[in-house]
C-alpha cells in the first residue's frame, strides 16, 4: 500500500519511509510464531532436543525456532529443502515435520506462500519422517480456486491446524 501511495504521489520521502516502517507485518508472515504459540493448547510436551531424541512413547513437540528445527531435520531426518520448519513432532518413534501457513486471500504473494508449504509435502522424500502442510484460511472455502482444487485432489498430508492434534493421535 505504501509503495502504491508513493507511485501515485500521495507520499514522498521521509513520510513514505515512516509509513513503511510502521506498517505491520502481513498476518501470513506471522503464522510461524502464532502457530508455535498454539502448541500448548494441544497438551503435548514441548521439549528440548536432548529429551526429544530419546523420547519413544506418546507425542512430543521439539522446542525451537524454525532455524533450529531445520538444523535438527537436516542432521536427523535427511531434510534438504532450503526452508525452515514450523513443527517437528514425534509420535512414539515416528517423526512428523511440518510447515504452517495462514492464507488470507487468493493470488499474488498468497499463491507463493501456498506453493511454499506444498514444497515440503511434495519434495521431502525420506522414510525417517512424515511431511505435513498445515494450512488455514481461504483455501478451505469450497470453490473453483486453484488452492481449493489443489488441496482437494492432492493425496498428501494437508490439514488445518485445528486438526493437528487429531492427526498426531
Segments and roles (model prediction):
Residues 29, 77-79:
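Active-site glycine- and acidic-residue-rich loops that bind
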Residues 10-17, 93-101:
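Glycine-rich, often proline-containing surface loops adjacent to acidic residues and nearby aromatics
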Residues 1-58:
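Interdomain/boundary linker segments immediately adjacent to catalytic/signaling cores
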Residues 132-169:
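Domain-level recognition of nuclease-like catalytic cores that cleave nucleotide substrates
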Residues 102-146:
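Catalytic cores of nucleic-acid endonucleases
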Residues 80-97:
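Active-site beta-strand-loop-beta-strand hairpin of nuclease catalytic cores
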Residues 16-23, 58-76, 100-108:
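Surface-exposed cleft-lining segments at the edges of enzyme active sites
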Residues 74-76, 84-86, 121:
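Generic recognition of flexible, low-complexity loop/linker segments
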